[in-house]
Amino acid sequence: RITLSNKNHPGMIGKITTVLADNKLNIIDMVNKSRGDIAYNVIDLETKPPEKVLVELTALDDVISVREV
């Protein structure tokens, strides 16, 4: 499971899921909630993400934090 917080801008879910797809990670479940300018995502993956995926997600513009739980 990955949790992310990001600025609530159009296209952010697409950017996040593209990183996961490019790294051959399958999303089992995903929840996206927003409050004002901030969005919070909980993404359940089929397999544990490699560290490089967390780094790639963190490097995306408008991502505030990324955590594996």
What positions do the PLM features span?
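A conserved regulatory-domain signal marking ACT and ACT-like small-molecule sensing domains
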Residues: R1-V69
